[in-house]
Amino acid sequence: RVADPDNASKLKVSGDGTAVTSEGLEWKMNPFDDWSLEAALRLTENAAEKNARVGEVVLVSIGPNDEHTQRIIREGLAKGAERGILVESEDGSLDSGVVAAILKAIVDKESPDLVVMGKQAADGDSNVAGTVLAEKLGWPIINSAMSIKTGDDGKTLEVKRELDTGVATVKVSGPAVFTTSDRILQTDSVKNGVTPDSHQYAKLEVGGRYASLKGIMQAKKKPIDNTSVADLGVDAGKTLNYTKFELPPARSGETTFVEDVADLVDKLHNTAKVI
């Protein structure tokens, strides 16, 4: 879960500047993880047949066991995931290394074929947890996947990934870690060898699919397993510690009216001194 980016104005820093407080924040599913959930659901369904699941999606959330986290997990279950795992932890006790260690413990227990996760968290933007997890597992990592296609042998995946300079196409077999870009939401981005290649998914602009009313009702009965960092035998010691947080300087809020373009240019040059 992450603090809702749309409510960033509510962010507060503790008096000593050593922490960001969660008071008054609203929580939601990490948007990047929502993209990954959509990819995982497409990989494990026959979209040409209503409600035809051909695999299992297990959600993992790390955070406090409160109503917000429970709601977010239920949201993912309502979209189609089969079950959830909640690893209880305080938000302030996590960094990318701890998250990767927790996920490795879950992977060791669950033995999934793939781990599909957001490339970053919307609040921290570290963009390293997936890579650290893959290193701990000894699995290949494909970051910023924009399309996934199952090979003719049913074992190989052909993946296109976004680069700053273009697109790279790679093939991978066996267990792997994927992080996804928003292009995974395109109508033909995932071909799993079961859903007909001619099938076109609904066009998604921002996030994954919406939950149906039936899915919402079914999600209430789907299992969520609770565990803790200690139960998983994970060292919860952070390797990254922030020394200070500062809010940006407050704006004056003053409004100045200008008569014409010449007046605007004069004020930008002589008063604001930005040109």
Language model segments and positions:
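A glycine-rich helix N-cap at a beta->alpha junction
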Residues: 68-100
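Histidine-anchored nucleotide/phosphate-binding helix
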Residues: 33-48
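Positively charged, low-complexity intrinsically disordered leader regions
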Residues: 1-17
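Short Gly/Thr/Asp-enriched flexible loops that form oxyanion-binding sites at enzyme active sites
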Residues: 72, 124-139
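Short, glycine-rich nucleotide/cofactor-binding loops
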Residues: 1, 21-36
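Short, acidic/small-residue loops that bind anionic groups at enzyme active sites
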Residues: 113, 118, 132-156
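Residues at the starts of beta-strands that form the adenosine-phosphate
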Residues: 49-58, 83
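Electrostatically charged, flexible surface regions
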Residues: 10, 145-275
